[in-house]
């Protein structure tokens, strides 16, 4: 049986709108680091006027069925998807009944994506955070989250965030960690340390205070 909110979300966004979200979400199925892109993905969904339910339907039933196999490929695609190929593949995936909202497709989705479901949960949490902020502050907030994520996961942090250090620290302690700490990887391929991740952010915040 299809949940009412999933059925509504399935066909609500226009094809032009959803194709841009397809391209964005598919980045998170590449064989490369993308956790720093989570806030930007959430911001694009919010800017597009999507509800969390609509974004979830696009992630679960359109993008994941088309590109989930790349997560398990020995030599997975990492440089980026060809736009036309990706759009055609997702349109094709949408035609299969198994990829339409329902209890069975939800089960298949969880089997397919496994650990990558955590990325969606983080996108949804960032969407909720951004939707709760005044519209005029959302770009600044998304940029601050991106800066924190880049430092947390040891990537190039980019430009200095416009939030003052005290607000940035509160954002990190009160909101960021709840969203991003579950994404720290501890598996057979690599082992990250939550302590080391936190130390990088604390060092970056200290550098901002001292500058």
Q: How would you describe each model-predicted region?
A:
Residues 210-211:
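Short intrinsically disordered terminal tails
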